[in-house]
Amino acid sequence: MEREVKFSLVFRDMWQSAGKYVPRVDQLVKVAPAIIEMGCFARVETNGGGFEQVNLLFGENPNRAVREWTKPFHEAGIQTHMLDRALNGLRMSPVPADVRKLFYKVKHAQGTDITRTFCGLNDVRNIIPSIGYAHEAGMISQCSLCITFSPIHTVEYYVNMAKQLIEAGADEICIKDMAGIGRPVSLGKIVAGIKKIKNIPIQYHSHAGPGFNMASILEVCQAGCDYIDVGMEPLSWGTGHADLISVQAMLKDAGFKVPEINMEAYMKVRSMIQEFMDDFLGLYISPKNRLMNSLLIAPGLPGGMMGSLMADLETNLESINKYKAKRNLPFMTQDELLIKLFNEVAYVWPRVGYPPLVTPFSQYVKNLAMMNVMAMEKGKERWGMIADDIWDMILGKAGRLPGKLAPEIIEKAEREGRKFFDGNPQDNYPDQLEKYRKMMLEKQWDKGQDDEELFEYAMHPAQYEAYKSGKAKEDFLADVKKRREEKANATTPVEAENKTKVLTVDVNGQPYRVTVAYGAVDPATLTAASGAVPAQAAPAPVGEGKDVLSPLEGKFFLVKNAQETPKKVGEKVNKGDVICYVEAMKTYNAIRAEYDGTITAICAN
C-alpha cells in the first residue's frame, strides 16, 4: 500500500524568507478561499515568527489578523500552525515565563492549532516548558531540531535530542533545515532514527538556496516523514522553499500517495500573490532572492540572510576602502570581502561553540565574523568588538552552547570580568505581566478578548506603543511612498554613471566632502564642500589628540538606553571604557577607548 505524504503551505515563511513584510489582513482573507480550493494542503502556516510584529510595524492589529486569517481554514478542516522561538517567544530576546504561558492561550483562542517550537541553540531546557504551556492551552506541541552541519551536529546528536523531547511529551517533531544545508542522506537517517524511538508525526521544513532540499525531501519521505513544508510561485526557490508542484510530481513518481492539485485554484493563488507584491510587498523583496546560491554551503548561513548580508557588505566595503584610500593601499572588491567573511565565519563558528545558524544566532555569528574582518583589514586585532547580545549567547544566558568555547574567548571574558551562566536561562527573566496590566490600566487601554492585547503589549512593547499612537502606520506609509518614488525614479546604468556624486576626498590628512556633477549644472544646487567629519566641540590642537575610530559604519549613539550616562567633552576615560555605540547589522556595537585620556572632541559624520 502506498504511504501517504501530506503538504503544508508555509504561507507566512514564504513572505518573510523573501522580504520584510507579510500581506495585510484584507489580503489574507481574500487569498484564503483559493488556498482551500487548491485541495492539497493538510496544514497552512498562518502566523508566528515575525507575523505579529510585522502587523504592528505597518500599523495593523495582529490579533484581528490571526483570528480572521485562521477562521476559513478551520471551517475547511485544515490545521493551522505557527512558529515560536521557545525562550524568545515571538521576538529576538528572552520572554518571561508568564508571558510565554499567555502566548499559547491567546494563540489557541485565536485559531492556531499547532505550535512549532524551536530553540536557536537546540537547548531542550528552553523547549520543554513550551510543551507544557501548549498542552495547557489545548495546542499540539511540535518540537524542532534546528539542522546545521558541523562535526558535533551528527545523526546521533539529533536523534538523542528528539528522544529527550519525545520523553518530555512532544506530540510531533519538526526537522527544521532552516538554511537548507542538511545533507540528504544524513537527514533520512535522522528521520529513521526518530521513528525507531516512536512512530510520531514528523514534518520537514527546508529552504532551497544551497540546492540540497529536493534530494532531502525525497530522502526524509523514504525514511518515514509525514508532512513536507512547501512554497509556491512566485515566492518559491531561492531564499524560499521547494515549490509544491515540483515536490508533488517527484513524490508521486517515487510511489507515495500525495494529494492532487486543483490547478485553476493554484493559478488564482499565484496571481493574488503577485497582486500583493505589486501592491506594496514587492517593494521589500530583492529580485536576487529568487536565485540559488551554493556559496552558502560552506558558511552554513540561512539564505534568507543574503539580502541583509549583501547590504552590510556594501556599507562595510565602503568603510574599508576609505581606510585603504587614506593609506594608499589597493582597494578591496565586494567578492573579496564576501570570501573573507565566509572564511571568517568558518573560523568564528567553532570558537563560539557551534550555535545552530538560525535566528538570532546566525546573525550573531555573521556579525561577529564581519567585525573581525573589519578590524583586521584596519590593522586591529580579532575579537576587539563583541556586542552585548553576542556576549549573552557566549556566556550561556540564552542557553547552553552545543560545543566548547575556544580558550581565547574564555580568556577574553575573564579579562573583562564577565561571568558564565549554566543555570536555567528562564531564571534570568522574571514575570512581567502584572507590570503591563498596570501600564494598560494607566493608559486606559483594553486588555482585549482573551487578554490578547495584554499579550501583544508584553511581547512587543515598543512596537505596540507605536501601533497604538498611530506612529507605526504613519512611518510605514511614508516608507512605502519613499520606496515607490525611488522605484519610479530608478536610473539606468548609463544615467547612474552620469549622475551627480558625492565623494569623500583626503587632502593632507583632512577628509573633505565634494560634489561631482556632469554636464550643465546650476552651482546653487550643489552643497559646498565641507569637512566630512564636522566637530561637535572644539578639537584638540593639531598633534595633541589621538583618534578613536569606529571600525564600522552605522548610526551613532552616545548611549544605547536611558540608564546610561553619555560621555562628554572634557571627561576622563580609561582604556577599554565604552565611549559610544554604532548601530550596524541590527546590533548596538560598543566603541571603546583605545587609550587613557580626556575626550577633547566628539566627531560624527
Language-model features and meaning:
Residues 36-54, 291-296, 300-532:
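Terminal or standalone catalytic/regulatory effector modules within metabolic enzymes
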Residues 117, 177, 223-242:
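Glycine-rich phosphate-binding active-site loops on the catalytic face of alpha/beta enzymes
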Residues 1-18, 66-71:
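N-terminal amphipathic alpha-helix/helix-capping segment at the start of soluble metabolic enzymes
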Residues 33, 48-161, 166, 173, ...:
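Active-site beta->alpha loop and helix N-cap motifs at the rims of alpha/beta catalytic domains
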Residues 539-605:
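Structured functional modules or segments
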